Amino acid sequence: MDTKMQSLPTTHPHPHSSSRPQSHTSNQCNQCTCSHHCRSCSQAGHAGSSSSPSPGPPMKHPKPSVHSRHSPARPSHRGSCPKNRKTFEGKVSKRKAVRRRKRTHRAKRRSSGRRYK
């Protein structure tokens, strides 16, 4: 009985002492991971919102940048648009339509081929 009692308390403090520093380090790690996660999250929000629609908070950041990009693009677009239309109105529209049709046909063929496989 004495041996069992001695082994129990001896075994008990050992895992306890080893567990203490682990929980301490894990706490510090969690704090680090949390701050890193927040930073990576905000960065991901910046990159993701421009390529795909993201939730409200991240959208607020890119809005001014998108607005500033659109402002200079609008007048230049307006200036080049009427010139292009007047010069190659029919030709450009026909070429675009033909190209689009070819692309859709290719995509349909590929998708149907994949489905058959």
Swiss-Prot record:
Residues 7-26, 44-53 have a biased composition (Low complexity). The modification Phosphoserine is found at S112. It holds the Pfam family TP2. It is found in: Nucleus; Chromosome. GO terms for cellular component: male germ cell nucleus; nucleosome; nucleus. The keyword DNA-binding applies. One of its GO terms (molecular function) is metal ion binding. Residues 1-117 are annotated as: Disordered. Its main location: nucleus. InterPro entries: TP2. The keyword Phosphoprotein applies. A motif (Nuclear localization signal) lies at residues 90-98. Residues 60-77, 93-117 have a biased composition (Basic residues). One of its GO terms (biological process) is spermatogenesis. Disruption phenotype: Male mice lacking both Tnp1 and Tnp2 are completely infertile, but protamine alone are capable of histone eviction. A significant proportion of Prm2 remains unprocessed. Chromatin in mature spermatozoa shows defects in density. Keywords: Chromosome, Developmental protein, Differentiation, DNA-binding, Metal-binding, Nucleosome core, Nucleus, Phosphoprotein, Spermatogenesis, Zinc. Zn(2+) binds at H12, H14, H16, H24, C32, C34, C38, C41. Plays a key role in the replacement of histones to protamine in the elongating spermatids of mammals. In condensing spermatids, loaded onto the nucleosomes, where it promotes the recruitment and processing of protamines, which are responsible for histone eviction. The histone H2AB1-H2BC1/TH2B dimer is required for loading of TNP2 onto chromatin. Belongs to the nuclear transition protein 2 family. This is Nuclear transition protein 2. It comes from Mus musculus (Mouse).
